[in-house]
Amino acid sequence: MILTLTLNPSVDISYPLTALKLDDVNRVQEVSKTAGGKGLNVTRVLAQVGEPVLASGFIGGELGQFIAKKLDHAGIKHAFYNIKGETRNCIAILHEGQQTEILEQGPEIDNQEAAGFIKHFEQLLEKVEAVAISGSLPKGLNQDYYAQIIERCQNKGVPVILDCSGATLQTVLENPYKPTVIKPNISELYQLLNQPLDESLESLKQAVSQPLFEGIEWIIVSLGAQGAFAKHNHTFYRVNIPKISVLNPVGSGDSTVAGITSAILNHENDHDLLKKANTLGMLNAQEAQTGYVNLNNYDDLFNQIEVLEV
């Protein structure tokens, strides 16, 4: 069983418009409302590829219940921790090939709720074999909250796949308890090191070999349409991917995380892990819906990916 954590989920609302009229009424004919958040995208893709998955995180109020009902409808198991605050909305206005987003900050977690979730998590940890943590921390949690979770996973021997950025990731990296996998994109990688971006192979090798990343088994760096670069222990890989028609790239990173987590759970070899992860990321990009993959195209893309030891 895989446990996914989305500590700051949202109800994602999409409003497609022919044109956005400012200071005027805009009428929308079709509205999409989904259970949102990076970890829930990971959850949906894991369920689609047939992995046993359990979703957790903080939810509150009617919007929190909406998320739970959406997962129920999709047949996805969940064990959320209920809080006093209200789960947030995140609104995307799609207009003239552009996307304007309005993102609520979300609820503030108090000390009692923060401690309560850790106890809740410890109980869930007894019955899972891998944990995928995605996205931002809600307001009120200490910056080292993910580090506390990772410490408990490490003590139980449960691998952790972590997808976050900025100060939250920096805090984890400076902590003695390390995740099994991190998945920064190339910009995030060099921001962590406070270095100018350099896409050359030698620079990437040097970057992921810095002391900041010591103790992390897998570092998988997204290079967008150029594929990926990875380090597994002391081995480096370059992943070349085919050109595809991209319909909606949002959620492709989360789908990649789902592939990594699935491969870790199933003890797949390095080449298959990297190919599965990138295949699912590309499949998501070919769909309008976020966190959705059409597995009919899986084998075709999988077989076109080239993984080279460098």
UniProtKB/Swiss-Prot annotation:
The entry's keywords: ATP-binding, Kinase, Lactose metabolism, Nucleotide-binding, Transferase
Single GO MF descriptor: tagatose-6-phosphate kinase activity
Species in which this protein is naturally found: Staphylococcus aureus (strain MRSA252)
Pathway noted in the entry: Carbohydrate metabolism; D-tagatose 6-phosphate degradation; D-glyceraldehyde 3-phosphate and glycerone phosphate from D-tagatose 6-phosphate: step 1/2
Catalytic activity: D-tagatofuranose 6-phosphate + ATP = D-tagatofuranose 1,6-bisphosphate + ADP + H(+)
InterPro entries the UniProt entry points to: Carboh/pur_kinase_PfkB_CS (IPR002173), LacC (IPR005926), PfkB_dom (IPR011611), Ribokinase-like (IPR029056), Tagatose/fructose_Pkinase (IPR017583)
Gene3D superfamilies in alphabetical order: 3.40.1190.20
Highest taxon above the source species: Bacteria
HAMAP family assigned to the protein according to its UniProt record, in alphabetical order: LacC
GO CC, alphabetical: cytosol
One Pfam family cited in the UniProt record for this chain: PfkB
Gene from which the chain derives: lacC
Name of the protein in question: Tagatose-6-phosphate kinase
GO terms under biological process: D-tagatose 6-phosphate catabolic process; lactose catabolic process via tagatose-6-phosphate
Family designation: Belongs to the carbohydrate kinase PfkB family. LacC subfamily.
Enzyme Commission identifier(s): 2.7.1.144
